[in-house]
Each structure stands twice: as C-alpha cells, then as structure tokens.
C-alpha cells in the first residue's frame, strides 16, 4: 500500500501512466524484488532399469509414509502423546530402504508432518492424514538438489540414485534460476513426468491500476466478463462423457488381474488425462490473457464445493457442471499470474448482491434472487439488464472501490 501511495504522488496531473525509466532514481526506489518459486513440468523417458528404480522409490516413499503414520496413531492411542519418528529409524529393520534416495524418504516424512499440521490448524478444510494406497495408479516422490545432485544437460536430467534420464525440454527454465526440488510422478497411464521447482528473483514495478475487470462465475461457461467476451468454456468432460462411459463399461467387464483388463485400464486413464490436459491448457491461456491485459480483476469469493452439493429437498444442484469447468483452479492460476506482474485479484464477499443491483442507478431488485430470472428491467431507471453481465459490471466497480 505504501508503494501505491508513493506512485500516486509521482503521477502527472493528467493521471496518465508514469514512465519510471524517465527517472532512474525513482525507478530504483519504487521497484520491488521478490523471491519466486516456479515449477516446470516435463515428460521424461526412463529406461526399463530406471523405471524399475522409480517404482522401487515410489514404493519405499509410500511405505515410510504409511509406516510412520501407523506408528504415530498407535503411539498416540497408547500414550496420548505425539511420536517424533524419522525414516532413519526404520533402515535397520528394513535394510532395502537404503537402496533408494534418502531424500525421497525424508520428503515423505515432511509430507506426513504437513498433513498433520493442516489437519490441526484447519479441520474445516482438511481431514485426518490417511494411508496411501498403491491401487490409485498415481505414484510420486520428491527429492532435493544438493550441490548439483539434480541438474540439466542437453536433453537429459540427472537424478540421485537414478542417473541421467532423457527429458523432453519443451521450454527452458527461467534464466538465472536455481533448482530447489524435483518431483517424479507416474500417471495411471504409465507416463513419467518430472516437476522442477526453481527459485529466482522477480522484479515487480509499481503500477497505477487503470484497467479493471469483473468476472461473474458462470456454471456452463466458466465466467461472464464485464468488459470482455465470455469465456465459453468447452465443457471437455461433457463432450467426452459417452466415450468415457463406454470405456469404463468395457473395463468393468474385464476379468480381474487379466492383461486385457490392464490394457483397458490404461485406455480409461488416457481419456481422463486428455480431459485434464485440455482443461489445464484452456485455463492457463485464459488466465494469461486476462493477467496481461488488466491491472485489477474482481471475482466473487464463492464456494464451488457447496454449489456442487445437492441441497436438502433436491431444490438445486449444479454437480458436474460446476466441477467440470475448474473455477477454483482458474482463480488460483489467475491470482499468481497477476501477482507476478504486481497486479491484483480482488475477492468480493459472497454476500455482495452483485446480481440484484442495477449498475446504472444502484437500485436493488430483489426478484433476481430467483436464479431463473436471467434478464430484467430496472424499475427505477428503466435499464434492461442481462443478469450475469450486470453482476460482472457490479463486481468490477466493487473491485475498483476496494483497490483504491
């Protein structure tokens, strides 16, 4: 906030954008340097031997997590106290744990500690830590970069206990960044990926908010914008419903443990991955476009989880329509893409009557509480409104007020 005040004092009288590069002293004093952590995800192509080593590491990390969780639960039940156990304590009893990367086991312990902290600090959103199953089809482990133990050279990446693994480096890491941790994962379809977390300095330059946008959540189209075309989300899950249902029926008819069942399981997994990738790509591109164009974006702080649940008496339920478009993920992506540029995402209180207020005169029309009312005329000024467009404009103006 202090930075914004300083910027306003430096503005010309006509309130145009100020060029900080016109005055190097002002430019130097007003910029902000922040440390940013950013993850890059790449496809990797391990050899058969490396796949086996990955599988062993996945299993050991899962074993340590489950073993430590089980011992903690038992110890707490007997004594009422917390057990501070570590992976090193189990290596004597289970010597095969020494064959894998020790940092993978240490990170499994950190994940368990984080699960407990989340549970104790926010029980409303986090449940008790649960045992990990090998039957989910998803496996992963994380390791840290220590003195160059993880590094990239050409089209290969070096990993502890694994060696050099072929990687599809479709985009370079951020220049002058440092590799902190990597996470190796295997999808249900059998593909291997690596997520590389890097740390770098990001220079954020103060801006005067000039371009404002309001987004109203749309059940079928992701959002309706105050000053843009609607998102028109393609509903990838709905489009793939028939194909996915057919593949799942075939899977249910395959004999347990047979090779044909495993092949069909992979086909189903590939369909799910395709839908997830399509959704991810769409959300990232939309968020990038909006973050580049606008300085402040306002949204309603709604609970998608609550909207997806059927209300008592079956009054309404948005179900799959809500969860398919990935609104929460879109908001998270949009928020950090704005923050990288020194911009702001403003979350409006969910009880703010954005759909009931006439954005022209401010009259409150209570009949729009009924969701079936999609268009209405203001009794005071006579303006004709589209429900969602009017709400988006009101959200924009409220975001403008809150960011002032």
Language model regions located:
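Generic detection of short hydrophobic beta-strand segments and adjacent strand-loop junctions
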Residues: 42-44, 165-169, 231-233
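Stable alpha-helical structural segments in soluble proteins, enriched in small hydrophobic residues
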Residues: 68, 104, 108-119, 389-399, ...
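Positively charged, helix-rich recognition surfaces that bind polyanionic ligands
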Residues: 175, 188-404
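Catalytic micro-motifs at enzyme active sites that drive phosphoryl/nucleotidyl and oxygen chemistry
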Residues: 30-32, 171, 181-184, 199-205
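Long, hydrophobic, amphipathic alpha-helical segments used as structural scaffolds
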Residues: 69, 73-76, 116, 120-127, ...
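Acidic carboxylate diad motif detector
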Residues: 85-188, 320, 324
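Gly/serine-rich nucleotide phosphate-binding loop at the start of the catalytic core
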Residues: 2-105
């Amino acid at each position: 906030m202090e930075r914004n005040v300083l910027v306003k004092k430096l503005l010309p009288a006509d309130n145009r954008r100020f060029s900080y590069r016109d005055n190097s002293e002002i430019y130097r004093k007003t910029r902000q340097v922040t440390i940013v952590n950013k993850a890059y995800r790449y496809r990797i192509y391990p050899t058969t031997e490396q796949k086996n080593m990955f599988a062993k590491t996945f299993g050991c990390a899962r074993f340590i997590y489950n073993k430590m969780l089980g011992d903690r639960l038992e110890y707490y039940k007997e004594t009422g106290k917390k057990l501070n156990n570590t992976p090193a304590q189990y290596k004597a009893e289970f010597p095969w744990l020494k064959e894998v990367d020790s940092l993978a086991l240490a990170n499994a312990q950190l994940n368990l500690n984080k699960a407990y902290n989340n549970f104790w600090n926010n029980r409303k959103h986090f449940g008790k830590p649960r045992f990990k199953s090998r039957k989910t089809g998803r496996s992963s482990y994380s390791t840290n970069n220590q003195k160059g133990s993880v590094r990239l050279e050409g089209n290969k990446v070096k990993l502890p206990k694994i060696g050099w693994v072929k990687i599809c480096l479709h985009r370079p890491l951020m220049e002058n960044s440092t590799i902190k941790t990597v996470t190796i994962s295997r999808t249900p379809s059998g593909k291997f990926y690596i997520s590389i977390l890097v740390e770098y300095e990001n220079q954020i330059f103060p801006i005067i908010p000039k371009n404002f946008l309001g987004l109203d959540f749309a059940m079928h189209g992701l959002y309706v914008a105050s000053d843009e075309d609607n998102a028109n989300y393609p509903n990838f899950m709905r489009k793939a419903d028939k194909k996915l249902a057919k593949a799942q029926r075939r899977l249910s008819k395959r004999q347990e443990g047979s090779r044909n069942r495993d092949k069909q399981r992979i086909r189903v997994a590939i369909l799910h991955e395709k839908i997830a990738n399509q959704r991810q790509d769409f959300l990232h591109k939309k968020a990038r476009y909006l973050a580049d164009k606008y300085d402040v974006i306002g949204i309603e702080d709604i609970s998608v989880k609550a909207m997806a649940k059927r209300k008592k008496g079956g009054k309404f339920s948005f179900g799959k329509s809500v969860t398919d478009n990935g609104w929460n993920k879109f908001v998270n992506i949009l928020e950090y893409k704005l923050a990288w540029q020194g911009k702001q995402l403003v979350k409006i209180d969910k009880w703010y009557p954005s759909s009931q207020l006439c954005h022209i005169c401010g009259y409150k029309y209570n009949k729009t509480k009924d969701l079936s009312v999609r268009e209405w005329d203001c009794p005071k000024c006579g303006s004709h409104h589209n429900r969602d467009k009017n709400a988006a404009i009101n959200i924009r103006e409220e975001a403008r007020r809150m960011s002032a």
